[in-house]
Amino acid sequence: MNAVSMHAFRRRALLPFRLAFTAFAFALFGLGGIVFGFFLTPWLKMAGGTPEEKKSLARRVVKRWFGLFVSVVTSLGLVRIEVKNPEVFQKKGAILAANHPSLIDIVCLLSIVPEATTIVKASLLKNWFTRAPILGAGYIPNDAGPEALVLLEAELSRGVSFVIFPEGTRTPIQLSEMPKMHRGTAQLALHANRPITPVRISAHPRWLTKDAVWWRLPQEPMVLTFEALPEIDVQTFQKTYNQSFRRAAVELTNAVGRALFPHL
């Protein structure tokens, strides 16, 4: 048996174990949501402090919970995580706009950034595993409307970072043109007069893509790379902003897209 055949045989032999490890990791993740709902939510309600302090505490709990999940999937050999320019992710009150190749990249990002908020699907508020953490941490549902800008600007002013995927959904595996990008991130940056930090995420091989099932594992562990790119200064778009807010938002959104997808 040659080296290639031996490697293929080893992959097939390890597949049942990798499936079991994956099921364990996601069960642990779901259990964290239940624990948050049944134990931490009542405790947060009884704890003293302002609503902002309670949200901050909840986010620290979520950060540790997500960090535990990341440690589990990396220790089990399911995923490898690489972070480029890690010091950038430690900056307070940053707007981090990323592409979205995998389901778990948001989990990784929220475990890296000291304190962050994000926008989530409103449907997740109906999910037993995710409702309590979302409400406790004050994450904003995507049906919040114009109020979201006001809430996010207030969070940024308190030093809370904002993690967002301008595509609004996971990045397709095959891209022949620039994906459609929502302008909300640019609108927030222009309103708050804050730069946008593009975060280019690469995933090889791709796993947990849109409409894919978790048990369809790639042959090799997925390598997730998070690269913080140079900031995009909104002052560059100030002249356009003074003439047309909408056009400035479009141009800024396009600039973010070019940074995230330079090959398109």
Can you describe what each PLM-predicted range is?
Residues 41-67, 76, 90-145:
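Catalytic core of membrane glycerolipid acyltransferases/transacylases, capturing the structured
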Residues 2-5, 9-12, 149-264:
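Non-catalytic C-terminal accessory region of glycerolipid acyltransferases
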Residues 2-94:
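Membrane-anchoring hydrophobic helices of lipid-metabolizing enzymes
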Residues 80, 115-116, 140, 159, ...:
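Secondary-structure boundary/capping positions in well-ordered alpha/beta enzyme cores
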Residues 81-99, 129, 151-156, 196:
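Alpha-helical membrane-embedding segments
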Residues 73-74, 134, 155, 189:
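A generic structural signal for well-ordered alpha-helical segments
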Residues 84, 120-121, 166:
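Thr-Gly-centered strand-to-loop micro-motif
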Residues 75-83, 142-146, 208-211:
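Short gly/ser/thr-rich secondary-structure transition/capping motifs
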